[in-house]
């Protein structure tokens, strides 16, 4: 027997049993159940067993489950009452998108009468009006229903009116008041994200972006709307609506009504007063209901109870039909063209194509073999340069072929002139030439080409592999540029640095070559130079770094002076693997990947207070990896501050280390700077939180040394925390001289391979704040050239729009970007700067960050 038949039999059994034992039943019920009066005990036993089986099957949502208060009336001794469900039990069958945000069938949820929540617990539901849904008075207090209803779908602006309240409902959820989105409404919520993403929190802005009657223009009244194509925006909304919502809604309601029809047609018509969802008395009425519901659903975004005239088609429907036809026509045309090409292709052409593919495979294999061989870095660099130029030429040729105007703009932009094209094709020959004038067009081309712009950054990450061949490489002595080997001169010329600057700051060029290749470069014989100490006396470079005050780790609740950092044995803080690791954690999804490892969202099965955590998986094979992993775990285990990510534990598994820490719902500063134009008060808030974390680190004699926008986490509740401590150093012995960190954020003393201390983090903080102010950071365009500029002269013009910002902001940035590290203020001194007093409060910042990361919150 299928589920629908089982439910139907139970419904009839309850009705007949109840009508046979109740004196106030009507005549129809008495007639229908008169033949069953002698079988009450047998029916009640059957009912009890069926309810128990239904509970194990977790059947729900068809609107036929009977009212349990009346089911238990006849003979309470023979029936075991179902256990009451808590909030977590009621939410368990639903699909969790993010913390406290679920999608599922609200009919089954709201018709469940076995609910027992705590006093302050309530489920907030977002969905369409449900005309057939009747909530029992006992469970009504557990729900708050937000109805999605639009006056008309003729105008996209009428839809935009309600987006703000829906987003605020989602953002305002808590563990005690989670939000459940009706399954068929999920597509509409996805569509609203596009408006929230472009800050459409008011109707005038929606008017300005989309226009009153023209849906194919682009508004440029607001600077952050310039790149928004309103036509694409509407198409995206329409696609999401019809793909994710309309079909689901039709299927859901249609299947529910079909189940009603099956129930009514398989048994004699019986009126059941005990069901929470009212059913009709005949199959013909159900058919009419199905037909009317389908008409309502086919009319676009509208209330299920309203029916649109046949001759009136909604705007979204028109747009979707047009887009659907265009896409189908394009697909058909593509298939036809491909078939014609296949027919026209001769045997000789097919052989040539196969030979070309074989050659490409051989080249890829050759590149792989080259990477494995013990070859000098310069040769590997040359090989990669050739591959990059080859890919670059292919992409330019493809773009020129597909461009509607023949690609003239692209050609002019990349080559400058017809002669510039020849320079581009003969790039290698020009690079081997010492004539700098012949290489200038190429340099300009590289600055404007995204492939070449990212080349230096890619090489920096790929060549710093820490292998033994780098350490055992020979020392190169070169007093000037002309005495460098040819392969390194070629490398320097690709950096787009003027020759007079190269000659003037040749020591910095040697430092950059060392950073690039891990070869040792000297301008004179190192045996004649005095030995450099590994550590330098800290002196005044650290500033006035007094030990910070923190909450007592023992739990007394009092503020105590933090102890200086000390190393604990690694085997005491990193647990060994156990056979129950799978029972401890359930991995859900990958949420991030960096240069050191991969981060996963994980459910902690043993500790419900820390149910959602993040686990960072780090390779633990090479000596360099082990060094960084041990350092990061020691720092995380020792630190205890609100602006530093919370550490839970770590595990050693084979050739990996797992670090378990708090999961931060939000994103990085780098992600936020690309999605939102931060105001000065917002930037001051970020500066204050970062400086508080640095003041704590410096107070316990630690320096981060890899502070960048990707290592600053921001949460939807307004928290700012520092992460990634693999390069963190203990300065209790003195300053370091090692060149490390990321190019854009590296201070000048580190680029010059001089001693560095706490104030290297101050420089990096200023660069992060400039990312928020400038957004399109010009420092990223050429990382190596930026490093040379920082090492030789610093950053002279930090702001792209200096008139936009206050004198306080200019002052704090100028103090942080002092070339002399001794002149930079400490983190504690900067916290007293007037700029910090402009900071927003945490509540306001939480709302801003929530709107920034709303896209990830709803799971798209």
UniProtKB/Swiss-Prot annotation:
Active site location: 706 (proton acceptor)
UniProt feature, compositional bias: Basic and acidic residues: 321-370
Domain Protein kinase: 585-836
Keyword annotations of the record: ATP-binding, Coiled coil, Kinase, Magnesium, Metal-binding, Nucleotide-binding, Serine/threonine-protein kinase, Sporulation, Transferase
Residues engaged in binding ATP: 591-599, 616
Gene3D superfamilies in the cross-refs: Transferase(Phosphotransferase) domain 1
GO molecular function: ATP binding; metal ion binding; protein serine kinase activity; protein serine/threonine kinase activity
Residue numbers spanned by region Disordered: 17-45, 264-378, 401-450
Gene Ontology cellular component terms for the protein in this record: cytoplasm
Requisite cofactors: Mg(2+)
Keyword Nucleotide-binding carried by entry: yes
Task performed by this protein: Coordinates organism morphology with cellular differentiation during development. Negative regulator of sporulation, synchronizing encapsulation with culmination. May have an additional function in prestalk cells.
Name listed for the protein in its UniProt record: Probable serine/threonine-protein kinase mkcA
Gene: mkcA
């Amino acid at each position: 027997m299928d589920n629908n038949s089982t439910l139907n039999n139970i419904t009839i059994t309850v009705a007949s049993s109840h009508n046979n034992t109740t004196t106030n039943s009507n005549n129809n019920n008495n007639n229908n159940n008169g033949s069953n009066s002698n079988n009450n005990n047998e029916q009640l036993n059957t009912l009890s067993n069926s309810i128990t089986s239904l509970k194990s099957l977790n059947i729900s949502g068809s609107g036929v489950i009977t009212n349990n208060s009346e089911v238990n009336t006849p003979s309470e001794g023979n029936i075991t009452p179902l256990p009451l469900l808590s909030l977590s039990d009621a939410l368990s069958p639903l699909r969790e998108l993010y913390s406290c945000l679920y999608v599922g069938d609200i009919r089954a949820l709201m018709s469940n009468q076995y609910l027992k929540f705590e006093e302050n617990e309530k489920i907030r539901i977002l969905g369409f009006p449900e005309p057939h849904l009747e909530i029992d008075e006992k469970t009504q207090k557990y729900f708050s229903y937000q109805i999605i209803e639009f006056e008309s779908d003729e105008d996209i602006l009428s839809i935009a009116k309600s987006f703000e309240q829906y987003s605020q409902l989602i953002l305002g959820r808590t563990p005690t008041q989670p939000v459940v989105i009706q399954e068929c409404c999920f597509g509409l919520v996805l569509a609203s994200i596009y408006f929230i993403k472009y800050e459409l929190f008011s109707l005038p802005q929606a008017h300005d972006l989309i226009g009153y009657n023209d849906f194919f223009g682009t508004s440029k009244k607001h600077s952050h709307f310039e790149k928004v194509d309103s036509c694409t925006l509407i198409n995206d909304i329409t696609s999401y609506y019809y793909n994710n919502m309309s079909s689901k809604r039709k299927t859901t309601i249609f299947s529910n009504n079909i189940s009603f029809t099956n129930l009514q047609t398989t048994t004699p018509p019986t009126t059941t007063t005990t069901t929470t969802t009212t059913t009709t008395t005949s199959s013909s009425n159900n058919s009419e209901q199905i037909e009317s519901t389908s008409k309502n659903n086919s009319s676009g975004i509208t209330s299920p109870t309203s029916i649109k005239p046949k001759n009136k088609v909604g705007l979204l429907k028109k747009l979707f039909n047009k887009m659907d036809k265009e896409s189908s026509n394009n697909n058909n045309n593509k298939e036809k063209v491909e078939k014609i090409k296949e027919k026209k292709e001769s045997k000789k052409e097919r052989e040539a194509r196969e030979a070309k593919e074989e050659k490409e495979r051989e080249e890829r294999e050759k590149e792989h073999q080259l990477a494995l061989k013990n070859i000098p870095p310069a040769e590997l660099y040359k090989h990669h340069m050739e591959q990059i130029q080859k890919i670059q030429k292919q992409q330019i040729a493809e773009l020129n072929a597909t461009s509607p105007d023949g690609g003239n703009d692209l050609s002019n932009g990349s080559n400058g002139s017809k002669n510039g094209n020849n320079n581009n094709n003969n790039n290698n020959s020009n690079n081997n030439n010492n004539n700098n004038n012949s290489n200038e067009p190429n340099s300009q081309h590289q600055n404007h080409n995204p492939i070449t712009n990212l080349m230096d950054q890619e090489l920096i990450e790929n060549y710093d592999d820490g292998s033994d061949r780098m350490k055992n490489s020979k020392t190169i002595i070169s007093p000037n540029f002309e005495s460098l080997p040819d392969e390194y001169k070629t490398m320097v010329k690709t950096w787009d640095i003027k020759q007079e600057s190269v000659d003037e700051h040749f020591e910095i060029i040697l430092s950059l070559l060392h950073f690039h290749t891990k070869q040792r470069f000297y301008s004179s014989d190192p045996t004649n130079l005095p030995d450099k100490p590994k550590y330098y006396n800290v002196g005044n470079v650290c500033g006035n770094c007094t030990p910070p005050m923190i909450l007592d780790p023992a739990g007394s609740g009092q503020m105590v002076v933090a102890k200086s950092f000390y190393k604990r044995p690694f085997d005491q803080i990193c647990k060994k693997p156990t056979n129950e690791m799978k029972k401890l954690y359930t991995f859900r999804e990958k949420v991030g990947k960096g240069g050191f490892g991969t981060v996963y969202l994980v459910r902690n099965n043993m500790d419900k207070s820390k149910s959602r955590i993040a686990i960072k998986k780090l390779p633990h094979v090479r000596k360099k990896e082990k060094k960084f992993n041990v350092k990061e775990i020691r720092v995380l285990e020792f630190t205890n501050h609100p602006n530093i990510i919370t550490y839970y534990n770590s595990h050693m598994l084979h050739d990996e280390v797992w670090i378990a820490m708090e999961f931060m719902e939000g994103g990085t500063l780098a992600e936020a700077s690309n999605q939102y134009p931060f105001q000065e008060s917002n930037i001051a808030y970020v500066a204050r939180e970062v400086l508080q974390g640095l003041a704590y680190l410096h107070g316990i004699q630690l320096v981060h040394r890899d502070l960048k926008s990707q290592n600053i986490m921001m949460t939807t509740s307004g928290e700012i925390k520092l992460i990634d401590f693999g390069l963190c150093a203990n300065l209790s012995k003195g300053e370091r001289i090692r060149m490390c960190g990321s190019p854009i954020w590296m201070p000048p003393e580190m680029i010059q391979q001089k001693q560095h201390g706490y104030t290297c983090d101050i420089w990096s903080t200023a660069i992060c704040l400039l990312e928020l102010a400038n957004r399109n950071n010009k420092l990223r365009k050429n990382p190596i050239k930026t490093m040379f500029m920082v090492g030789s002269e610093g950053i002279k013009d930090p702001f792209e729009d200096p008139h936009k910002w206050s004198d306080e902001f200019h002052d704090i940035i100028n103090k942080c970007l002092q070339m002399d590290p001794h002149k930079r203020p400490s983190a504690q001194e900067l916290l007293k700067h007037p700029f910090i007093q402009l900071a927003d409060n945490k509540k306001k910042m939480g709302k801003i960050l929530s709107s920034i990361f709303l896209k990830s919150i709803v799971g798209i």
